[in-house]
Amino acid sequence: MAASVEAAAAAVVAPPASVGGDEVVVGGGGGGASEQARTLIGALNLLSRNLPLPPAVLHAVSSIYHGGDAWEGEGEEGGEEEVAAAAAAVGDGCGESGEGEEDRADASPGADEGVTLIQELEDAVLKNQGPYMSYSELTALKEDRFNTSIQHRLTELEGLPSTRGEDLQMKCLLELYGLKLLDLQKKVRTDISAEYWLHKKCAHPDRQLFDWGMMRIRYPFTMYGIGDSFSMDADDINRKKRFSERISRLEEEEKNQAEIRKRKFFSEILNAAREYQLQVPASYKRKKQRNDGVLAWHVRARQRINRMEKSRLQVLKAGDQEAYLRMVEESKNERLKLLLGKTNELLEGIGKAVQRQKDAEHVSRPDGSELPKGSESDDCSQISGLKVESPDEESPSDVDADHHSSADHSKFNAGHRLDSTVHSIEEKVTEQPSALEGGELRPYQLEGLQWMLSLFNNNLNGILADEMGLGKTIQTIALIAYLLEKKEVTGPHLIIAPKAVLPNWSNEFKTWAPSIGTILYDGRPDDRKALREKNFGQRQFNVLLTHYDLILKDLKFLKKVHWHYLIVDEGHRLKNHECALARTLVSRYQIRRRLLLTGTPIQNSLQELWSLLNFILPNIFNSSQNFEEWFNAPFACEVSLNDEEQLLIIHRLHQVLRPFLLRRKKDEVEKYLPVKTQVILKCDMSAWQKAYYEQVTSNGRVSLGSGLKSKALQNLSMQLRKCCNHPYLFVEHYNMYQRQEIVRSSGKFELLDRLLPKLQRAGHRVLLFSQMTKLLDILEVYLQMYQFKYMRLDGSTKTEERGRLLADFNKKDSEYFLFLLSTRAGGLGLNLQTADTVIIFDSDWNPQMDQQAEDRAHRIGQKNEVRVFVLVSVGSIEEEILDRAKQKMGIDAKVIQAGLFNTTSTAQDRRALLQEILRRGTSSLGTDIPSEREINRLAARNDEEFWLFEKMDEERRQRENYKPRLMEGIEVPDWVFANDTLTEKIPADEPQNVLLTTKRRRKEVVYSDSFGDQWMKADDVVEETPRMAPRAKRSAYSSDVQEVDFSERRKRHKSLVNIADDASIPMWTPEKVRAGVSSYSKDENEDDAEDESTTSVLQGGSFTWKTLRRKRSSHFSNSSDSKGRSAF
């Protein structure tokens, strides 16, 4: 075996045999070691090319390894032949592979033995090899040593000191930099070698076309012990390298797959996003189209509903009730159906109550009394010209029509049935009664007479509510004359009117029906007693004229008479059904028929209208709550009504009112009546007025001229109105007989001073209305100083003097230019159509009062255009009053409006308005003031008057040297700006909060009709006291100036000469011109506390000034009403 190994080693180191192509050349002849070596080299070449060994070569190689036995057993010849055969097999190599496959099966037993022999050889080599390192390890060790040496040298060079010579230092630095460039050098060398190899090997690809087997990895030959440990280590390294490359390739592939999946995932997301982006506009477009379609459908539906509403509204205005009801059914509007059903129930209930009223007498007849002719329905049916329709009886044709008609059509038929029920007995009036001698009735007055006669025939009562100035008095006289002439109803009739208009009633009876016995029941108790003794015994009268006061005072006498007709002029006096007058007339007097005359049936609310209806028909309109709920219930929670619902409510209410209320307007019946134009003239305030206005709004008190003491005020709204009128209203003892100061201290007086001379020169006559009688006194002083001819009528004017005053003013070529009237006393029932200009000095919270005053001139008989001037202080509380008045006028224009159902307007809102006025203070005073030219344009009725007014203004400016027209701050007396700290000391036990929102007690005035039950118990002896007797003496100021009566002050100033700065002003001596002028100590405001419903918009809760102390005012009375409650 050792010989074999040595032979193999010798073969390895021996020079290789020449190989030509793929053929192994084995020499013949001698055999021996050279031949074996050549055989082994050929086999090695085949194995290196990864080619299978031919069986002969395999057998020869095996025989070489098995050596002696094989070779010795077979003999020398046999061995040479086998070697030659192996060499030939190797030479035939690839070409005769087929034959090798066939021979391999025969040599398989020897092959197994060869494999075993090679394994044993390898084990022996591994066992006997000494300690050594592989080539790769040696190379790595060498590299490590080399790198360590270089690193050591770098450290050594870096640590060398710099004190060496220059040459040595340079060499060390060069060596150091060279060593540091080692890595760069390796990289450059590697790159250059790679480039060189690529250029060399790949420059000519066509030359590299050879057997691809040569490109395979050359493994070192280690079979059969040929090779060394270095070859095996290299094989191990290559194997590990291939494994790591495979692992890297797998990782790279997995990474690529993950990247692919990731990209695919994000690609899917992006694709989904792109699809979503494409779908969103499409979806939005589809949604928009759908929404547009829905919106267009709703628009078309709303347009269709609006068209139907407009059509229904037009049909409702036209009065086509059947068509309207059919359209309501088609629209399926539940709100309208509910409203129709509720109001239909009201109309049916009223119709039944009316029928019951007609069947019975309104008031039980006293024993022994006889019915007047024509008073019963059965008797009236026999009168020629009467048409009787029983609501319970219907013709067969009507029954058939009702049978075929729908039940819903009764909603509107209820209104017709109510009208026909009330006026089922009709009597045509074609001519006026012959007893009327004063003139001819107008057509609309004949219609009014026929309407009142229809109520009489049907045993019902009513309200004649014609607009003021249309002759309600004449129509009433015509009714009495007709009843006397045609029905033989001689009375007696009771006519109740305000005291101011009693002379007018008496004059109208004398003028139009002198044959009717009329008594004016007024005067002192003795006079009235004489009238009763003379006329009541034999009943030598037909009509008794009296006023509200005597109805209560002479109750025990007047209630004994069985009155046939009760006629109440200015019937809105009964707008409170709980007042003493209404309760007394209903419960204590015996009355068969009732008739109310009023030009303003609705002043503030639906409650007032019900009160009037309740007075005339208490059995029908017996519940105020039900009356309001009938119209309020359908929309108790929804107060906003559209135009159609509001008009329907108005229409249905008209159906309720139409049978009992007749109202005509001037523009409807009097087409030739001159127009009435209202002009609002705004004026500024003087510095004095602004000072007082600011004091009232800031601390609720004003400074007086008596010892520089201020005074706490009550009823702030009234105090602010006084500030707007004139500052003299606060300083009672101030010397007002100064010609210039009385004008310059008030903006309204300054405007009046410019306006009155122009109106007088233009030939106009003026009615001037004010609510404050004390202001009328100041106006009197002004008119006397400037020598204007005037008259005055207020609550203190006696009844017998009022007729004379009216006659003197209305007579032809009367010398009187101006008539001073109080709004409350002079605005009712007076005929002053000879004047064509009305000046409202201060507006009332209730616009109807101003309307009544305006219509004193704008009435039948007026031939000139009527101009109404309303004076308003800019930025003050008067603008709020004007705005509220405009809102209230809408109630009368529509008779009823949605605001009447609105119960949210409470006292809190009114209190908030007062607080807003006080908070605003004087910030808006004096803004938006018209110029003189604008005022002239508003006041002039034509261009000629305008240029006349312009000329008069220029003359006045030149005469006054262009001085300021209003008082400036430096001209105001110093005591006006006195500090409030100088007020009187207040006891410690008095409360510190002063109630400022209270109102004064109602003072006694002649026209006043707000009397309670105490008048029924009053003794007649009280009447013996003069009416103008002085009242309880007020506490005087704590100053040297004593309280003096105005008449005494006039006497003291009778010979006073005006010593003003202007020397051109002549001497003036006051004269008492007007008739019936009372002393100056009368009430400063005849009715500054208004009726309950219109007291003031600012009423409704206490408003206190905490910075003030309570101080008993010597200027006003106590601030609580008769029930002890504070009121504003």
Curated annotation (Swiss-Prot):
Phylogenetic lineage: Eukaryota, Viridiplantae, Streptophyta, Embryophyta, Tracheophyta
Pfam families, A to Z: Helicase_C, SnAC, SNF2-rel_dom
Primary subcellular site in the record, as a coarse category: nucleus
GO cellular component: chromatin; nucleus
Annotated organism of origin: Oryza sativa subsp. japonica
Protein keywords: ATP-binding, Chromatin regulator, Developmental protein, Growth regulation, Helicase, Hydrolase, Nucleotide-binding, Nucleus
Biased composition regions of type Basic and acidic residues, renumbered to the chain: 356-376, 400-415
Subcellular localization, as worded in the UniProt entry: Nucleus
Coiled coil: none
Record GO biological process: positive regulation of transcription by RNA polymerase II
Protein name: Probable ATP-dependent DNA helicase CHR719
Keyword Transport on entry: no
